[in-house]
Amino acid sequence: WAQVVSQENLPNTMTMLPFTPNSESPSTSEALSTYSSIATVPVTEDPKESISPWGQTTAPASSIPLGTPELSSFFFTSAGASGNTPVPELTTSQEVSTEASLVLFPKSSGVASDPPVTITNPATSSAVASTSLETFKGTSAPPVTVTSSTMTSGPFVATTVSSETSGPPVTMATGSLGPSKETHGLSATIATSSGESSSVAGGTPVFSTKISTTSTPNPITTVPPRPGSSGMLLVSMLIALTVVLVLVALLLLWRQRQKRRTGALTLSRGGKRNGTVDAWAGPARVPDEEATTASGSGGNKSSGAPETDGSGQRPTLTTFFSRRKSRQGSVALEELKPGTGPNLKGEEEPLVGSEDEAVETPTSDGPQAKDGAAPQSL
């Protein structure tokens, strides 16, 4: 509510108008510019209207200049106003007289304010209403006292203006959550502000308490590795190593077996020299003339010479070194004996030293056979 005082026609009439505290109002500079005529015109109080609550004594008229900006935020009320009841603020109106009206332009602020504090001075029979207190976050400033000097033929007026006081100091309490063995959590910070009262003389104490809490996130848990996992890893590595060793052993055995097979082949090819290979010559062929002479000269079968039929069968050789080959050689030498003469007998006898000749010697003529058989016995 706002109070409008008009002294133009009805001196004792008060008009109450609704007023919103949070609504925006013109600033002090705008008020001074709009009501420049009001600040220069002195206000004259009627002695009949200045009534004291302690008596019906009249006070002399006094003129107070309104040119001071510090006093533009206060207004005077009649002495009949109670000291405990807050005095409503004044606002602008078209019905207010330009000669005897006082207008209060409150400071707009978004911060919630307390009810105004009224201080009553019984000596001067006047009440001074200050603006409401506002709470801020910061360091508090000491109150400022503005005292106006006594005017000529006027009472002493004392005005106390309290500056805006800040809120109570904030106490921070920080608690940290210690990490456990397996759970790694983050620290939680809880900030709590303690409330302290700040008041002005004659006003209502102000209490403010704010509690801010920061939420802690969910703890992060890390799962440690199980002791059995390392053992399983070691076992798997051992198994893999064993399999590799077995494969290597099998490969070596197969290689040795292959070497053995190739060794038998190399032994069979050991007679190979300078690109030529020794091979079996096959059956030996005897000329037809030699075969016929051998069969004719050997009259008995004991000589071991093969008998030839009418078809002319040829003897065959099965091996390089055999008794049959030596027999054939001896037969060939015997064929050469009658044609060569006695000079070759001594040379041929040591060459043909076999038991077959000893058997054949009795069939030969005279003492020559005996002489030839004698050195063989020796």
UniProtKB/Swiss-Prot annotation:
Q: Where is this motif: Nuclear localization signal?
A: 259-273
Glycosylation (residues): 13, 15, 20, 23, 25, 27-29, 33-34, 36-37, 40, 108, 113, 118, 120, 124-126, 174, 176, 180, 183, 187, 189
Gene Ontology cellular component terms for the protein in this record: basement membrane; cell surface; cleavage furrow; external side of plasma membrane; extracellular space; microvillus; plasma membrane; PML body
Residue ranges annotated as Cytoplasmic topological domain? 255-378
Q: Name one GO biological process term.
A: negative regulation of T cell proliferation
Tissue specificity field: Cell surface of thymocytes, T-lymphocytes, neutrophils, plasma cells and myelomas.
Report residue spans for region: Required for interaction with EZR, MSN and RDX and for co-localization to microvilli. 255-285
Q: Which residues lie on this side of the membrane: Extracellular?
A: 8-231
Q: Which residues carry this modification: Phosphothreonine?
A: 276, 316, 361
From the record, give the transmembrane residue ranges: 232-254
List localization entries.
Answer: Membrane; Cell projection, Microvillus; Cell projection, Uropodium
UniProt keyword Cell membrane, yes or no: no
Q: Where is the composition biased (Polar residues)?
A: 310-321
Instruction: State whether keyword Ribonucleoprotein applies.
Output: no
Keywords attached to this entry: Cell projection, Glycoprotein, Membrane, Nucleus, Phosphoprotein, Signal, Transmembrane, Transmembrane helix, Ubl conjugation
Q: Where is the PTM Phosphoserine found along the chain?
A: 268, 311, 322, 326, 330, 354
Matching entries from InterPro entries are given as: Leukosialin
MF terms per GO, please? heat shock protein binding; Hsp70 protein binding; protein domain specific binding; transmembrane signaling receptor activity
Q: Where is this region: Disordered?
A: 13-33, 265-378
Q: Which residues form the signal peptide?
A: 1-7
In the bilayer, the protein is annotated as: Single-pass type I membrane protein
Q: How is the protein altered post-translationally, as described in the entry?
A: Has a high content of sialic acid and O-linked carbohydrate structures. Phosphorylation at Ser-330 is regulated by chemokines, requires its association with ERM proteins (EZR, RDX and MSN) and is essential for its function in the regulation of T-cell trafficking to lymph nodes.
Assembly with partners or alone: Interacts with SIGLEC1.
Known role: Predominant cell surface sialoprotein of leukocytes which regulates multiple T-cell functions, including T-cell activation, proliferation, differentiation, trafficking and migration. Positively regulates T-cell trafficking to lymph-nodes via its association with ERM proteins (EZR, RDX and MSN). Negatively regulates Th2 cell differentiation and predisposes the differentiation of T-cells towards a Th1 lineage commitment.
- The protein depicted here goes by the name Leukosialin
